[in-house]
Structure formats: C-alpha cells, structure tokens
Amino acid sequence: MSLFGNTTTGGGGLFGNTTTPTQTTGGGLFGNTTTGGGLFGNTATPTTGGGGLFGNTATPTLTTGGGGGLFGNTTAPTTGGGGLFGNTPTQTTGGGLFGNTATGGGGLFGNTQQQQQQQQQQQQQQQQQQQQQPSTSLFSQSSLGSQSSLGSQSSLGSQSSLGSQSSLGSFGQTQQPQTSSLFGNLQQQQQLQQPQRSIIEQKLYDFMQSISPNSLNCRFLYWFYNYQANGQLVDPNSIPKPPNVTVDQWAYALSNNPDPSILIPVAAKSFDDLINRRMKQEETIIALDQNTQEALKRMRDLENHLNFHIHTQLEMMRKKQIELIQRYIEVWSNLEIYQSKGKTFTTSEERIMKKIYELFEEINQPNSIKSKVEEISNQLKLGSMEKEKIKYEISPEAVEPLYNLLKNMTISIERITNELEIAVKDAQILKNELYQLKKC
C-alpha cells in the first residue's frame, strides 16, 4: 500500500483486516482501502472499489454479514467508492464514521442517489436485519425508532450535518425515514414545558395575589369601623376609597356601616393591619386611662377644696349663730328683768328655777350623762385596743351593723351634749338674773 496507490492484497493495517484476498483498482490520496475490519469496522467478503482525488466509479459488489466497528457496521451489500467531492454508487450500504445508513456510501461533501425504489427495498431489508442481528456502536443504539443527528436531520433523502445528501448518521443508525434531531427534540421538549411552566407561574401569581394586601384579589379582608376624631359628623360620600379594595367591596363596607354619621370604614387585609390596629387601640386605651386619672385627681382636689372651705364656713356660721342666740337671750333677759322689776316670783318661775338647779346638779354629779358618755367612749377605746391585741377576725357582715350602731350612738351623744350645753348656758343666764334680782 503506497501513499497514492492501491493495495493488491489483503493485509492488516491500522484501519482493518480482511479475511480473504481482495483486489482494488486505482487509488489516490483519498482513494480506497481494500476491505477489512479494524478500528472502524469489519467486512466478511472482499470488496472492490477505487477512489481518486475527486471521486471514482465502482462496480457493485456484495458483502454478507455485518460486523461491528467502533462507530458502526454494514448490514447490506455495498459498493465502496468515494472521492473527495463524491462518486456515483449503485445501491450500496456502508459504514459511516458515526453510524450506519441504509443507502449508498458517501464522499466527504456528498453523494448522489439513484433508484429510489431499490433504496426503499434495501431499507426494508436493513430493518429486518437490524431486528434479527442488531449492531452496536459506541455512541448510539440500533432501533426501529428515529435517530438523532448533531444539529441536522438524517434520513433517506435528507440533508446531513455537512449540508449534503448522504446517509451518514451521527451518533446513531437510521433505519426508518423519520426526521429528528438532538436540538429538535430539545425544542419539542421546551415547547411542551413552556405551557406547563406558564400554568405553574400563573398559579403562583394568583396565589401571591390572593395573599398580597396591596392586591385587589386578596382573600383576607375584614372591615372595622373607627370613630371620627373630635366628634364631628361624617359625610359617607366624602370618605375616600382605599386604593387596595374594589368598588363592590367599598360599597359593601358603606352599606354595613352601623352609624354612617360618626363611623368610618377601615379595611384590614393582613396580620400587620391587625397588629397596627391593636397597637392603636392600646394607645387609645392608655390615653383614656390617663384622662380618667386626671379627671379623678381633679375631682378629689375639688372635693378637698370644697370640704375645707365649706367646713370652715359652716363652723363660722355656727359660731355666729351661737353668738346671735346668746345676744338674743341676753336682750330678752334684760327686757324681762326690766318688765318684771318689783314683781314677785310666780309659781311657774319657781318651777323653772328648780329645774335649772336640778340640771345643774346632774351635770356636776359623777353619775351624770356627761360622765356616762366619757365612760362609754373609754370602754370603746379599751375594746379596740384589746381587739388589736387579740386580732379577732370579724366578718364584714358583722362589722357593718356594729359600725351603724356606734355611729347612731355617737350622733345621739353629740345631740345630748349640745342640748346640755344649751341648758347650762340658759341656767347660767337664769342664775345671773336671779342674782341680780336678789340684789334688787
């Protein structure tokens, strides 16, 4: 085998071995090799063919059986011949670099096909042989389905990846006239995935809109009603609609307003709105509590002020009244003395005189009412001190009637004391008058 020549006998080389002697005709730089299986494939019978720089013509020869090469095998009769720019084979099947084809072998840039009917018959034979005797390649599997090509569609009568009509497949074997490609399948898958993605994206968008407080389609919506500040009346038509609610929702809120004259609808569409509303209510409650405490403080101050001034004024009025009574008694006594001057005592006057003396003696006696009152008060004080020592537990139901009793007793004692003081004063006045009468 020479660089530009032909080989006359079969031998083992880098690209294959032959099992029987072969004869070749013609050979150039890109000519023919004899036959044989090697790195790229094996054949069981001799083949003939020749190749020149720009192509050759070959006579049909038959091969039997199929062998597996690194990238493919031949399964049908072939006539090998290929030039640099092409040749005219007749019904051949040959192994390409990346796969097997059902029709003639190819040159580097393309081949011409002949006899479409015979090609179809050979294709059917190849399909049957592939079913019975499948061949394998490094980058593809043999099947009855469609095969893929690197960036192009490979089939009978279709364009290859190099832009020429050939039966060379890439990474696979073609047995049926179906057109498919690696990128075509990806495009089909992407086209199928695009509707699915759009549906999922639409569902996600709808879900986000249903929970977004700024969306009109938010499902979380509840209406609260706030009081108008400063107690002013509200005009429902002058209330602006919030931007994140629809017209129907706003109309529903206005229609369900319990008192449109003082209440304003407020929409709550999220937990943040509820939290803000709760914080505002707490602030309002704190402000109301502060106002209440201030009002109570002012009321206490006013009560203390009134009690102090009224009590002092009442005491002053009582003192004035007592002075007036004393003056009146003094005037009346002087008048009576002047009128009764030189007259004798009557029986009634004598009785009054006796009563006055008796009252005066009772007051000064140790068993008088005054002493009894002091004794009772001392006993109460001692009883309270003993209670503090013993620490008896008295129920509120028992304390209340005792308190009322003591209160009534204290009031009665004060009244008796006042009456006694008045009686003592009257007795003193009478005593003075009697003393003056005696002088006269």
UniProtKB/Swiss-Prot annotation:
Name the family: Belongs to the NUP54 family.
Q: Region Disordered: what ranges?
A: 1-188
Specify where the region named 11 X 2 AA repeats of F-G lies, as residue ranges.
4-184
Q: This chain belongs to which protein, by name?
A: Nuclear pore complex protein nup54
Q: Which UniProt keywords apply?
A: mRNA transport, Nuclear pore complex, Nucleus, Protein transport, Repeat, Translocation, Transport
Compositionally skewed regions (Low complexity) per UniProt: 110-176
One Gene Ontology cellular component: nuclear pore central transport channel
Q: Per UniProt, what is the name of the gene that codes for the protein in this document?
A: nup54
